[in-house]
């Protein structure tokens, strides 16, 4: 789409956040090229949705003037990590054409257990999971991330909604 709207798909935050707009242009040509690059699944092009907070909240810090075209490709929540890893490998060919690919979202992101009174402090399991994930990514060791269910309690708590029981 030529002019994606800013989507505020969240709740429970200060009103100022809902007023943020990120008027970056879209690029139907890059969207079509992305669609044609992906062979492992069918990719639909949407003319309605726009850029949700998983996209604009990151890109607005990299390009505050909203002067680069942005397209958003959402994850398929019905598919597992291996599927998305393979999808990302397909997308990597776009980098050779000068297209920046950003995977956004927090590695440890569970607002259901956030302690709003102590926002500067993390849970031990969250710190452990975050540190381990960063180290694996830095080392290029993606197999444990794909097989996150085998990585111990810290990953279990994160990936399964921060269960508070053993």
Cite the ranges covered by each PLM segment.
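A short aromatic-anchored loop/beta-hairpin motif
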Residues: 1-45
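Short, basic/glycine-rich phosphate-binding loops at helix/coil junctions
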Residues: 9-16, 63-72, 146
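Internal, conserved structured core segments that host functional sites
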Residues: 31-85
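Active-site regions of metal-assisted phosphoester/phosphodiester hydrolases
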Residues: 70, 76, 84-102
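Short, hydrophobic/aromatic alpha-helical segments in well-folded domains
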Residues: 33, 87-91, 107
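Short, well-ordered beta-to-alpha junction loops that form the rim of enzyme active sites
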Residues: 49, 104-107
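Surface-exposed, charge/polar-rich loops and edge strands
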Residues: 68, 79, 93-99, 107-166
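Flexible, glycine/proline-enriched loop segments at strand-loop-helix junctions
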Residues: 17-25, 74-81, 158
């Amino acid at each position: 789409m030529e002019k994606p709207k800013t989507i505020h798909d969240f709740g429970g935050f200060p009103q100022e956040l809902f007023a943020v707009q990120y008027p970056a242009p879209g690029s139907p040509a890059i969207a079509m090229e992305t669609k044609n690059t992906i062979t492992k699944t069918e990719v639909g092009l949407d003319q309605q949705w726009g850029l949700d907070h998983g996209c604009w909240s990151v890109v607005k810090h990299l390009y505050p003037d909203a002067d680069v075209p942005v397209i958003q490709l959402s994850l398929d929540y019905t598919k597992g990590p291996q599927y998305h890893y393979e999808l990302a490998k397909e997308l990597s060919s776009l980098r050779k054409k000068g297209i920046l690919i950003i995977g956004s979202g927090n590695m440890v992101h569970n607002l259901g257990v956030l302690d709003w009174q102590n926002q500067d402090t993390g849970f031990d399991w969250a710190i452990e999971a975050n540190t381990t994930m960063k180290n694996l990514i830095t080392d290029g060791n993606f197999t444990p991330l794909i097989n996150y269910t085998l990585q111990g309690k810290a990953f279990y708590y994160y990936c399964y909604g921060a269960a508070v029981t053993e």
